[in-house]
Amino acid sequence: MTGKTHAICGTDTMLAITAVSFRGLPIDGHTYLPAVGLLSVAAGSYMPDIDLHRSKMGQRHKFISKHLTHRGITHTLLFPVIFIVAMLMAAAAKIPVLPELIMGFNVGWVVHILADLCNRKGVPLLWPLYRRRVHIAAFLTSTWHEYVFIILWLGVNVACVFFLLR
């Protein structure tokens, strides 16, 4: 998927989370305000492609993109787990706004991985436990397939919001 698709899907998902939990999400003694996460979700949506030298993040961080293979470690569940731990630690330390920013960043990162799971190339989701790439669909990047994917993603989010708010 392209960077724009990742940003659209990540932001849409964060908007959906915000819509169904506008007053906050109580997790482990802290009430997270997902609306604050809207500030960081697009960055999180782009970050897994820091390993791709042609991507915006890869261009900004050439040292990293030069030494990592595309859809390698950055497309696993390892980073989202690290971000969840960081989010909980920031909440426990009572650092204002930071947990929400980490939450938004993490939502963007996870949505990026989920979107790439729908691409024929797949992702090494369970690396290092399982090194093979997995995919659940075969949408082609930079074709009309990608537009269909975006419409389906937006539709699922709208349906989830509608169902959860009724």
Q: Where do the language-model regions lie?
A:
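N-terminal membrane-targeting hydrophobic helices
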Residues: M1-R166
